[in-house]
Each structure stands twice: as C-alpha cells, then as structure tokens.
Amino acid sequence: MDLRQFLMCLSLCTAFALSKPTEKKDRVHHEPQLSDKVHNDAQSFDYDHDAFLGAEEAKTFDQLTPEESKERLGMIVDKIDADKDGFVTEGELKSWIKHAQKKYIYDNVENQWQEFDLNQDGLISWDEYRNVTYGTYLDDPDPDDGFNYKQMMVRDERRFKMADKDGDLIATKEEFTAFLHPEEYDYMKDIVVQEPMEDIDKNADGFIDLEEYIGDMYSHDGNADEPEWVKTEREQFVEFRDKNRDGKMDKEETKDWILPSDYDHAEAEARHLVYESDQNKDGKLTKEEIVDKYDLFVGSQATDFGEALVRHDEF
C-alpha cells in the first residue's frame, strides 16, 4: 500500500486508530478558533485580519501597500456581496468568514481532485474514487496487514452516497468536499456521529455504554492506576453524557457529545466588524464603509510599492 493510500484510509476511517495507554482520544468536533492572536483592537487588528482573510492570506496582505490593500479589499467586497445589492450584511460577512477559515479544506480538495478525476470530466464518480483508493486491494480485500479493506470500502461508499445529494454516484467538487470533510456540512452530521459510534460500540447493540466509552479513550496498562482524567471522564459520562440515565448513550446523546453546540466565533466577528464599520448605523455595510476601515479588515505594513507581494490566485 503506498503512502497516499495509507494516509487516505487513515483520514477517512478511524476504526483502526490506536491510543497509547494514557493518551486521551478526542472524538469531539469543535469549531476552530478564528485566530490564535489576542482579540484586542486597542493593541492591533491582527485577530480581525486572520478572521476575515484566514491566517495565511492575512500574511500576504501584510506585504502590500495601503493602496494595494484597499484595491484588493474592494475586490473581496464584491465577492462577499452575494446578492449583488451593493451592501454587505452581517449574514454575508459571517458566510465569508466561515469560507475564509475553511480555505485549507478547499485547498486540500483541490490538491486531491486531479488524482481521482480519472476521465477529467470535472466530476468524481464512486467508481473512480474506489479504483484509485483501493485499486489492487479489490481482489484481496482482507490481506494480512491488519486492514479490512472491504469494511473500509463499504464505509466509504456509504459516506459517498450521503455526500452525493442527487444520488447519481457522481460527486461535484462541493459533494466531494462534503465526502472528505463531513464535519463541515450540516447534512453530513449523521455520518459524523454514526462512524465513531460504530467504532466504539463493540457489542453492536446500537448504544455506547460506560466501558465502551472509556475503552475508546483509554487502554489500561497492566496494574497501573487510571490517570485522573479517566476518572473525570467516567463522571462526565454519568452526569452529563447519559442524559436519560439509562447507563448508555443513544444516537442523540452521542451527537450531543461529538458535535457540541459551540460558541459561533464567525457570527460574533461579523457582528463586531459591522459595528465598527457601519458609519450611518443602518445595519449593513457599503464598499466605501469597508474600504474606509481597511486597517480593521485587512491591514497593511508595506510602505514601498516594490515590497508588495503580488498574488493572482485570490481566493
């Protein structure tokens, strides 16, 4: 099995992941922070730049002159204004921020696209994905290397079908993104819960009991005492995870654990940007209002045009 296939299988299937005896396995999907910078506008707008552009793109703007920053910001505003009414709403800003934060996901899909789109038709069929990913293992789906490729392929096919909204077994780029990164799509939430639930539910009764819950996180090492975090997780299961106190977690309880309702950082940042930039206080932003506050949105550190780092692949 080549390295690419090995990494692909590992990224799509968690059933075979192993933990060190005292290493906690985290199944929970949290909304990522918009930036690792401190959000303090009195000191700098670095947090806002990372949130609005994504951390990597924000570094690019740091190399531009103010004039270039304003010009490129104006181009971005045209993209944010989804309904082309000349205004940017809080909702449109929130959508843009979420898009900017997920740019690494889209880049990941782009990097893999040509590898799977064998006939170069701009789509990826299930057959194309299966042949590239499993290839020679189709004839021997149960080799002696510890991987059950038949089981992995069945799981991948189920996920592919769920991502494939129109049911034609051919994925558009957006559907393929949902297949590779289901945690980012609301309509894929069930599979995000179902897959780890199947991994943890060792007795296949459709529930996760306390021992299965702990066993997924912690492998006991001989006579060693359980670390403190394991005791805490036992208490968490009894007090919070098992809401109906029947000694096990059903699908909804598992969903609440794996996909918690986190604070919406993108919504908060969109609200903040509108508040700081909305000069006439009408609850929406014009391009002029945004560009006037370019230092808040994108910033600029370069003062010499010759220092500018010019990129042509803007988003």
UniProtKB/Swiss-Prot annotation:
In-chain residues carrying the UniProt-annotated modification Phosphotyrosine: Y47
Residue sites binding Ca(2+) 2 per the record: D117, N119, D121, E128
Every EF-hand domain range: 68-103, 104-139, 151-186, 188-223, 229-264, 265-300
Motif Prevents secretion from ER positions after renumbering to this chain: 312-315
Source domain of life: Eukaryota
Principal place of residence: endoplasmic reticulum
Phosphothreonine found at: T65, T254
PROSITE patterns: EF_HAND_1, EF_HAND_2
Pfam family, one: EF-hand_5
Compartments where found: Endoplasmic reticulum membrane; Golgi apparatus; Secreted; Melanosome
Residues linked to a glycan: N131
GO CC annotation: endoplasmic reticulum; endoplasmic reticulum membrane; extracellular region; Golgi apparatus; melanosome; sarcoplasmic reticulum lumen
Record-listed Ca(2+) 1 binding positions: D81, D83, D85, E92
Chain sites annotated for binding Ca(2+) 4: D201, N203, D205, E212
Claim: Repeat is one of the keywords in the record: yes
Signal peptide: 1-19
Residue sites binding Ca(2+) 5 per the record: D242, N244, D246, K248, E253
Keywords, sorted A to Z: Acetylation, Calcium, Endoplasmic reticulum, Glycoprotein, Golgi apparatus, Membrane, Metal-binding, Phosphoprotein, Repeat, Sarcoplasmic reticulum, Secreted, Signal
PANTHER family: CALUMENIN, RETICULOCALBIN
Function field: Involved in regulation of vitamin K-dependent carboxylation of multiple N-terminal glutamate residues. Seems to inhibit gamma-carboxylase GGCX. Binds 7 calcium ions with a low affinity.
Subunit organization: Interacts with GGCX.
Similarity annotation: Belongs to the CREC family.
Protein name, entry field: Calumenin
Species annotation: Bos taurus (Bovine)
Lineage of origin: Eukaryota, Metazoa, Chordata, Craniata, Vertebrata
Name of the gene this protein is made from: CALU
